[in-house]
């Protein structure tokens, strides 16, 4: 791609981003990202979060999802969050900066969870996108498989899993895998998710024993 094409593409993205009504609302409300609205839509539909819950937030930065969940679980709840990128502190959120693909980071995250009964694991993780689906989709699928592995390790029976997945090769198999582990599984495309994006959110509730 030439510099001129890249510049035109970047300009279009910036124009779309700043004219996006959810970006504008997020700025007005002082929210960390437009992702707040995606999780709010999921909560309105599926009633995932309740006061006092312990929640694991993967791919947490800049903090939109954690910021939302704090309002739902209250002071008695707890969020253990992780991201490769830094995140400004949020009261009630225990943040670990590191690469979730790294075994040592995974171990440190499990240590922070400790003996807590985790009621929700949520993942908004995504790889750096190259724009080539043949490269991007396998990278994204690897991350969501790791998130599901975290569910197997820490999620309490009856717990819930919310995960961003990009539709493409491996999606159907992944969905079948989740259906085998949870009693109820929905695929959501929130209004606040950009229409041209391949992303959808799998909302799985009732982890089987």
From Swiss-Prot:
The keyword Signal does not apply. Specifically methylates the uridine in position 2552 of 23S rRNA at the 2'-O position of the ribose in the fully assembled 50S ribosomal subunit. Pfam families: FtsJ. Belongs to the class I-like SAM-binding methyltransferase superfamily. RNA methyltransferase RlmE family. The lineage of its organism: Bacteria, Pseudomonadati, Pseudomonadota, Gammaproteobacteria, Enterobacterales. SUPFAM superfamilies: S-adenosyl-L-methionine-dependent methyltransferases. One of its GO terms (molecular function) is rRNA (uridine-2'-O-)-methyltransferase activity. Gene3D superfamilies: Vaccinia Virus protein VP39 (3.40.50.150). GO terms for cellular component: cytoplasm. The active site is at 164 (proton acceptor). S-adenosyl-L-methionine binds at residues 63, 65, 83, 99, 124. This is Ribosomal RNA large subunit methyltransferase E. HAMAP family: RNA_methyltr_E (MF_01547). It is found in: Cytoplasm.
